[in-house]
Amino acid sequence: MTIPTEATRPDNGFIGALHVSGPADEHVDKLMLFGQFVGSWDLEWAGTGANGEPATATGELHFGWVLGGRAVQDIWIVPGRGQPGEGQPPSAFHGSTIRFYDPSIDAWRSTWVEPVNCRVRRFVGRPAGGDILLVSDEEDPQLRWRFTDIGPDSFTWQGKASHDGGRTWVFEEQMRATRRRSR
């Protein structure tokens, strides 16, 4: 199969139609809940490896404004591009989340898409004290993703799962993010 030449051109219109430089004026205060993360980050991942043993890896994370500044999209890559194990399931992941503020529920709707491991999950996110908590309870296992220890140049992301309808939660993984400085 041949890829059409138009699709491979960097100026094909897709990037310009998707990405914007900042938030939309409407709900700008609410948009900054995730807008504060716009930029590039280095990740230190810790979790359980494919063999069931504790594992660590480094990766990368990129946040940007999309869809007219009404949403924030991110790309999580662990291990990072060019690192051993990149793109090799089940331990690696390379996925994207699109999040937008929905004033009808005063919360963020969020969808995670991760083709390496064939995952799609929907979440609802809200501020929780100084943290941000995202909950996915439409299918098993239920998931809780938390942004915590949030500062201008670092944060921690934690993932937990419940296999009993939310009665108990098990730690799955954690990522420490450090903002990249302009190079």
Enumerate the predicted regions with their spans.
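Amphipathic/hydrophobic helical signal segments and adjacent flexible N-terminal regions
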Residues: 1-54, 62, 66, 181-183
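Tryptophan-centered short beta-strand motifs
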Residues: 41, 53-55, 89-91, 108, ...
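N-terminal glycine/threonine-rich, aromatic-flanked beta-hairpin/loop signature
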Residues: 55-93
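Short, surface-exposed coil-to-beta transition loops
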Residues: 56-60, 91-96, 118-122, 140-144, ...
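Residue-level recognition of beta-strand termini and adjacent short loop/turns
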Residues: 67-68, 151-153
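Helix-adjacent hinge/juxtasegments
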Residues: 78-120
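Acidic, glycine-rich flexible loop segments
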Residues: 126-143
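Conserved Ser/Thr-centered positions that define the repeating blades of beta-propeller domains
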Residues: 160-162
